[in-house]
């Protein structure tokens, strides 16, 4: 009888160690420049990043966004990939995030959301 209890306790201990070693890892924290999308706007409509960095877009709203090269100008969409800018064409679902390609050229670049009028972001890339 005692032998069965002792064996059961040993097996239970081994199972506990095995399960503890398979613990759930927390997600990696977001690192790098971040643009937050709140409702139909960028939280900040300008940002400065370093050459070679990418931008992480965090959609904190319940509506999807599309981020592309260009800008809203006088109420009209002006789609344009400026010289030196990475080509950006991202669909970002509600409460999700996406990352652009890196900005490898210094300069000022425009990005916008074509489904939300007036939603523009100006990115300044420095050396």
Where are these regions (language model features)?
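Extracytoplasmic copper-binding redox domains, predominantly the cupredoxin/blue-copper superfamily
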Residues: 2, 21-127
């Amino acid at each position: 009888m005692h032998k069965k209890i002792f064996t059961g306790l040993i097996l239970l201990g081994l199972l506990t160690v095995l399960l503890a070693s398979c613990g759930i890892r927390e997600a990696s924290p977001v690192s790098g420049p971040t643009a937050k999308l709140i409702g139909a706007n960028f939280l900040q409509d300008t940002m400065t990043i370093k050459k070679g960095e990418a931008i992480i877009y965090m959609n904190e709203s319940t509506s999807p966004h599309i981020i592309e090269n260009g800008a809203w100008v006088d109420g009209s969409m002006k789609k344009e990939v400026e010289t030196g800018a990475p080509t950006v064409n991202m669909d970002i679902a509600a409460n999700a995030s996406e990352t652009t390609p890196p900005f490898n050229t210094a300069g000022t670049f425009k990005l916008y959301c074509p489904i939300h009028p007036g939603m523009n972001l100006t990115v300044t890339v420095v050396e």
